[in-house]
Amino acid sequence: MNQTTKLCAATTLALGTLIGATVVGTASPIHQEAQAATTPYYTYHGYIGHNANFIMDKHFINAIKYDNVTFNGIKLAKTNATKKVEKYDQTFKGVTAKGNEANQLQFIVKNNISLKDIQKAYGKDLKKENNKTKESDSGIFYYQHSKKSLGIWFVVDHNRVVEVTVGHTPYKTSK
């Protein structure tokens, strides 16, 4: 009788474990979550003046391509506004009433960034606007992935970048 009790107990335990494992296995749903693609972005805080090297950063260039650039809490976006705001050493144009979006950003470059530096960073996508100057190392150079995306314009004077504009509207000098 002792062996029969042990056999029944072992069978009950084995069956209980098998059924329990099966129930637990099917009770938890399988999650196959898709990872959302992250849109490239670039955020800048503070003064730019002597620290404009970020304009050659591949992450900044990629963020321009994807229209996802923010400076000092103001996102560059297509706006119909006309308000102009000075923040740190930057001029924002087309700032919305809430002050969180602007159509264009301009700043003066105070460190030595050369035409060759931006040509290396932007490659063959960097173009010269209208060839208004006969000098090859001066004029307005720009990069714009498509006509509907953000663009960046560089004012170059004798191989030196002196002013930068980032925005959706064509460049107009601040001078």
UniProtKB/Swiss-Prot annotation:
Superkingdom of origin: Bacteria
Where located? Secreted
A cellular component term (GO) from this record? extracellular region
Keyword terms: Secreted, Signal
Signal peptide bounds: 1-36
Is rRNA processing found in the keyword set?
no
**Is Signal set as a keyword in this record?**
yes
Family, per entry: Belongs to the IsaB family.
What the entry lists under NCBIfam families is as follows:
IsaB_fam (NF047686)
The protein's name in its UniProt record = Immunodominant staphylococcal antigen B
Lineage, uppermost ranks: Bacteria, Bacillati, Bacillota, Bacilli, Bacillales
